[in-house]
Each structure stands twice: as C-alpha cells, then as structure tokens.
Swiss-Prot record:
It comes from Prochlorococcus marinus (strain MIT 9313). Its EC number is 6.3.4.19. The lineage of its organism: Bacteria, Bacillati, Cyanobacteriota, Cyanophyceae, Synechococcales. One of its GO terms (molecular function) is ATP binding. The N-terminal region contains the highly conserved SGGXDS motif, predicted to be a P-loop motif involved in ATP binding. CDD domains: TilS_N. It catalyses: cytidine(34) in tRNA(Ile2) + L-lysine + ATP = lysidine(34) in tRNA(Ile2) + AMP + diphosphate + H(+). This is tRNA(Ile)-lysidine synthase.
Length: 343
C-alpha cells in the first residue's frame, strides 16, 4: 500500500484529540500497522480519512482506502470514480467493489456485504505482504451512529449485548473471529456535528449519498425524525446515549467474565450441576444458560425460551428436555443439565 501525502494543514484540536486517544490506547491502531479504511465519501468517513492522512507521519501507518458501491442509485458509480481520483491525487492506494443487483436489498444485507468484502481485501493485503499483514479495518462510525443503534435496538427489543453494540473494537467477522481481522471505530468519541466541522476546516470533499435520505431505511428515519426531536428537548442527548452504550459495553464485558467463572464452577463432566444452578435466582440462571449455550457453540435462544429452560430446572421440577435449532437439544436430569448435538 502506498503512503499518502497531502498539503499539511496546521495541527488542529481535532488532530490532537484523536492523536491523544490513540496514545492512550496504543493497541487500538498500533504504530506502523497496515490499515484498511472503509470510505463512503460521506462526512464521517472523509473526516476519519483526513485525520489519518495527517497523523500518518506520527504513527507510521500504511493506508489503503476501500469503497463499497451498493448500486442503490445512478450517481453511485460517479461517486466511486471521483473518490478514486481524489485518493490517487493524495497518493493513497484505492480499491472498490460494486454490489450486484439484489445483493444489498436492505441495511442488514448491505452491512453483511460490506464486511465480507472488507475481510476479503484485508486477507488479500496480508497475503501480498505476509510480513506486514492487514489486521485493522476502520470505519467512520461516530457517537451519533451509536445513539441511533441504541434506539433502534431498544425499539426492536434486545438484551444487554444489543444495547451495548457498536463497540470500538471487535472481530470484523462474527462467524469467523479466528481470522484475526479487527473492526475499529476510532471516531466513536466524535459526533456527526464534529465530523462536519472537521471536513470544513480541513477542506475535505464530501460526496452526498441520496440513499442517506431514503425513508425506507429505518436508520435514516431515526436520524432525520427521531433524534432531532430528542435533541430539541434534551440538547446533547446523542452524546449521552452513546456514553451510556459505552458503559453498558463495559458492564456486559464484566458480566461475561463473571459468568465464565461461574460456569467453570458449575461445570461437571456431563454438563452443568443442576442442584447448584437451581439455587441461583432465575435471572442469574437465565444469564448463565445463555452464556453456556454460546460457549458450547449452540444457537442463541430468544429470551422466552431461555426463561422456560431456567424455570424448568428450578428446585422440585421434573426432568425434561427442549429441542433447539440445528440439531441441538438441552435436557435436564436430576443432577445435571446437558447439551447434545446431532447432525
């Protein structure tokens, strides 16, 4: 990947803010790392790219830009071409993919397609330079995105993990975490208002995507209709919601660590000790059962089913079983709770 070069603007408070954040978290974007940056051309990803270009000389990164064309509107190919020309004028390596018709019909499939393509490109960069593998994929998500996600998940119905989603760092592939490619969101401490100012002050171009105004996408409606009302009632609420999501993320991580310790104590050769598990409050039993299923590789269950199992193994309840998806079955005997899997 080529190094970037641009006319250096004066060091700004925005540069200092991200720079100090990275110094305080040296493992987030290590010095001299190979970084693959997802850039749509919108203000958030362009603000991230502009800051990284200027900080590159201090951190020694290798930068490559990836652009995903969802093929949602007629201007998408033009945006891809103009962004490519801008990157090349700044000596930035650039690659892009265009989705096939029907491949990105909604927000979920579009997100899956993007992360799949980013994973493939990161693996390509690593195979081309095995001594300098690409293990970091960056996106321009901000605290505003995090607040939107919290509201959407809350409205749909979710658990603690859903409310604490959009972490600063996670494996990019939830299905294949062993691939060792991390998804990094360096701008979660910045708001959408911040990224607009960054682009303005650094003279960065912005490509407006008509899809961001499409009311068929639930996130757009939250962004354009819900959050403005909440901000007018309680200014700064987006930042507070994002901060709450971060605290919930830490709480969820703590809960997971404690649950793993508890499961180790409850584990026996043929499953979990039913007697000890049954002595716990039903909410604690339900939480431990969820982590036990996840650790065992079983499919996740809706809260209703988890509570059903938890109630069924309470003291005085008879033995029983419950068939799960994909050939899994939970059964509880007098002394144990067991998990079986048949292809």
């Amino acid at each position: 990947m080529a190094s970037s070069s641009s006319t250096q603007l004066p060091w700004s408070a925005w540069h200092a803010r991200l720079h100090h954040k990275l110094l305080a978290n040296p493992d987030l974007l290590p010095a001299k790392a190979s970084l693959l940056i997802a850039v749509s051309g919108g203000q958030d990803s362009m603000a991230l790219l502009g800051l990284l270009i200027d900080l590159q000389r201090k951190h020694g990164w290798s930068l490559e830009v990836w652009h995903g064309d969802h093929n949602w509107h007629k201007q998408s190919a033009t945006i891809a071409t103009e962004l490519k020309n801008w990157c090349e004028s700044h000596n930035l390596s650039f690659c892009s993919d265009q989705a096939k018709p029907g491949q990105t019909n909604n927000e979920a499939t579009a997100r899956h397609w993007r992360y799949e393509q980013l994973t493939l490109h990161a693996e390509r960069l690593s195979s081309n330079n095995p001594n300098h593998p690409c293990r970091y994929v960056l996106t321009g998500h901000t605290s505003s995105d995090r607040a939107e996600t919290l509201l959407l998940n809350l409205a749909r119905g979710t658990d603690l993990a859903g409310l604490s989603s959009m972490r600063q760092c996670r494996p990019i592939s939830k299905d294949h975490p062993h691939k060792n490619v991390q998804l990094i969101r360096p701008l979660l401490g910045f708001s959408r208002e911040d990224t607009a100012l960054i682009c303005s002050e650094l003279g960065l171009p912005i490509w407006l995507d008509p899809a961001n105004s499409n009311p068929d996408f639930s996130r757009n409606r939250v962004r354009q209709e819900v959050l403005p009302v909440l901000e007018s009632l309680h200014p700064g609420c987006s930042l507070r919601m994002a901060a709450l999501a971060e605290r919930l993320n830490h709480h969820h991580a703590d809960q997971q660590a404690i649950a793993m310790l508890a499961l180790n104590n409850l584990s026996k050769q043929n499953g979990l000790c039913r007697k000890d598990l049954a002595q716990l409050p039903i909410t604690a039993r339900t939480t431990l059962l969820a982590y036990w299923l996840k650790r065992s590789g079983a499919p996740s269950l809706p809260a209703v089913q988890l509570e059903q199992i938890s109630q069924s193994i309470a003291p005085g309840k008879p033995p029983g079983s419950l068939h799960l998806a994909q050939g899994w079955k939970v059964q509880w005997q007098r002394n144990s709770v067991q998990l079986e899997h048949h292809d």
